[in-house]
Amino acid sequence: MEGAAGGEEKKNRMSSERRKEKSRDAARSRRSKESEVFYELAHQLPLPHNVSSHLDKASVMRLTISYLRVRKLLDAGDLDIEDDMKAQMNCFYLKALDGFVMVLTDDGDMIYISDNVNKYMGLTQFELTGHSVFDFTHPCDHEEMREMLTHRNGPIKKGKEQNTQRSFFLRMKCTLTSRGRTMNIKSATWKVLHCTGHIHVYDTNSNQPQCGYKKPPMTCLVLICEPIPHPSNIEIPLDSKTFLSRHSLDMKFSYCDERITELMGYEPEELLGRSIYEYYHALDSDHLTKTHHDMFTKGQVTTGQYRMLAKRGGYVWVETQATVIYNTKNSQPQCIVCVNYVVSGIIQHDLIFSLQQTECVLKPVESSDMKMTQLFTKVESEDTSCLFDKLKKEPDALTLLAPAAGDTIISLDFGSDDTETEDQQLEDVPLYNDVMFPSSDDKLTSINLAMSPLPASETPKPLRSNADPALNQEVALKLEPNAESLELSFTMPQIQDQPASPSDGSTRQSSPEPNSPSEYCFDVDSDMVNVFKLELVEKLFAEDTEAKNPFSTQDTDLDLEMLAPYIPMDDDFQLRSFDQLSPLESSSPNPPSVSTAFQQTQLQEPTITTTTTEELKTVTKDSTEDIKILITSPSSTHTPKETTTATTSSPYSGTQSRTASPNRAGQGVIEQTEKSHPRSPNVLSVTLSQRNTVPEEELNPKIIALQNAQRKRKMEHDGSLFQAAGIGTLLQQPDDRAPATSLSWKRVKGCKSSGQNGMEQKTIILIPSDLACRLLGQSMDGSGLPQLTSYDCEVNAPIQGSRNLLQGEELLRALDQVN
């Protein structure tokens, strides 16, 4: 039993092995037959033998299907029979193209691709044929690719055909390196392809339905794919019809090749900073805008042929390859480099398309008159004979130069350097040149002439040759104390030890002297000194008649006597009277003093500044020789022991009439000290002795203009006291403990003092505004001063032949006449 069972097992084992062996042989036979079929099929494909012999089965099937589709397309189309000449030219078509040919089905399969794809993409033809295009393109381009493959078979409007043209940019895998080597497909980079073509619809010839339905027409997309070369990898040298340009990210020129001048007429310099959109034809702007959008999205574009405007009119056809250059550090876009191919000459060169093209058209043409003007405006070191020779060559220019009948010949006045210096000084006073300084403005000049105080019948007399040109001869003669010639030499006083005259030698050696004429007036800031050029004030207040550093006397175009006094319309600045001289007896032992009026009004005022009798001895000695004007300017905390007196050689001394200057009221109560000596002049007062009355019409209008200008100028300066009472002024600056307060200009009023000897004395009181009424209300030697109103001052203006203020009924009658 056991032996029989063992024999059966062996038989079964042998039978199973035979079946397996037969199965293996059958499978091997099938594979061999299949391989023979694929081998035969591969050799049927239009591929080289070395390629087809190495294809796997899947590749053979893929390529065969693609070939069958292509054959179907070719059979569906109306193909012409090629002759021998066309057959020979077929091999040159791909060489002429800057790309490869690709045919896609409606589902995106690449049924055909030319064999030169390896040259541009690194991938071979059989590696791509039959595959889906979506396997080798950028994922961001898939949606656009599907839109390009879609063909709408819906109803079409009458008279309008469906657009089958396609042009788009596609990023595809590339296995080529910059050196031309091939890399693995996994390390491939993206390369931008400019795909242009159309959708072709193939209708089958079999009109009979198959299997009960009719097949739809087959559509395919035929494309020519042109890769855009990188500017750094351009192998072919650029010809004369090509120029390079670089642009910023907003498409403005940052560089342009010089060859654009020969092609379009533009200079590279005039394009820098200008947008490229300014030079596009209007009909191509939409297409170029979309192209630039694709450039920033995909990195490279080719614009195709578009019209670019020439400089002098017309346009040229251009095709541009633009590439975005990225920064190697941060991979950010940096600039745009364009390779521009000009494919035509200038078309319609006489047609204007933009405003830039009108610049050359509207350029003015030079005429003979312009040439003549250039001869005069051109500055050359040539003599007049050479100029005449040039004009002689232009007959029209000579006729224009010749004067016609009735023409007014104006002689040229070539001023000296002094005139230029004077004009420069006048320009330094742009604001305050209405009264005091000659105005360079014609309007101000006309106003000043209209406001002149001189009557129309009175004409200014010529000036003396040895006098100041700014002074009128008639006024200068009145200012002369003696019959000798008036020699005025305006100098800048300097500190010196020797006296200027024998009469004041004892005092000038010990008394400090101002360093500059501006210190005679008042202390101002450096900025204000620059604004107020006090040349006239320096001349009027100059002490020394000996010329040390003489100023250059310059002729002025406008005489100051033609300038009218400034007449304000408000109550802040009112007209004041001229010096109204009253008789005063020379033998009066105790002349009236104004100090009593000031001593009674000390309410919260600074301490009184006094002057001893010894300090006024020199003043008493010279009281009968000249005007004695003592001005005190409190500036510190001590009082000097000596005063400064006037020089006897002052050109303004003598019996003359003048108008007191306005005063910068100080901070302190003024005390006039004449108690020690009966004939000494009053400190801080103006004493005009031995004077003859002169009518107001003969007063110096230049001094009037100076006074009005100073009264008009509103300045606030701490610790300054400026008192001016005419010409020939002597300054004394004792220190005062008074604090600095704000000062304001006020009216100057004259008071009549009693006398016995007929001498005329005038006291000018200059006071702060807050003490005006109280000072005027004080009594002087038992008789009170009348409190005057604004009408009083207006009515009591200087009247010819009148020396007294109106009182009582006379004042009322005068007011009635005014009203």
Curated annotation (Swiss-Prot):
The modification S-nitrosocysteine is found at C793. Transmembrane segments: none annotated. Residues 7-31, 614-628 have a biased composition (Basic and acidic residues). The modification 4-hydroxyproline is found at P403, P565. InterPro entries: bHLH_dom, HIF-1_alpha, HIF-1_CTAD, HIF_alpha-like, HLH_DNA-bd_sf, PAC, PAS, PAS-like_dom_sf. Residues 532-576 are annotated as: NTAD. Keywords: Acetylation, Activator, Cytoplasm, DNA-binding, Hydroxylation, Isopeptide bond, Nucleus, Phosphoprotein, Repeat, S-nitrosylation, Transcription, Transcription regulation, Ubl conjugation. The keyword Cytoplasm applies. Residues 582-613, 632-655 have a biased composition (Low complexity). Residues 577-778 are annotated as: ID. GO terms for biological process: axonal transport of mitochondrion; cellular response to hypoxia; intracellular glucose homeostasis; positive regulation of cytokine production involved in inflammatory response; positive regulation of DNA-templated transcription; positive regulation of transcription by RNA polymerase II; regulation of gene expression; regulation of glycolytic process. A motif (Nuclear localization signal) lies at residues 711-717. Residues 18-71 form the bHLH domain. There is a cross-link at K533, K539, K548 (Glycyl lysine isopeptide (Lys-Gly) (interchain with G-Cter in ubiquitin)). The modification Phosphoserine is found at S248, S552, S577, S650. Residues 495-518 have a biased composition (Polar residues). The modification Phosphothreonine is found at T556. The modification N6-acetyllysine is found at K533, K702. SMART domains: HLH (SM00353), PAC (SM00086), PAS (SM00091). S-nitrosylation of Cys-793 may be responsible for increased recruitment of p300 coactivator necessary for transcriptional activity of HIF-1 complex. Acetylation of Lys-533 by ARD1 increases interaction with VHL and stimulates subsequent proteasomal degradation. Deacetylation of Lys-702 by SIRT2 increases its interaction with and hydroxylation by EGLN1 thereby inactivating HIF1A activity by inducing its proteasomal degradation. It comes from the Eukaryota. PANTHER family: HYPOXIA-INDUCIBLE FACTOR 1 ALPHA, HYPOXIA-INDUCIBLE FACTOR 1-ALPHA. Contains two independent C-terminal transactivation domains, NTAD and CTAD, which function synergistically. Their transcriptional activity is repressed by an intervening inhibitory domain (ID). This is Hypoxia-inducible factor 1-alpha. The gene is HIF1A.
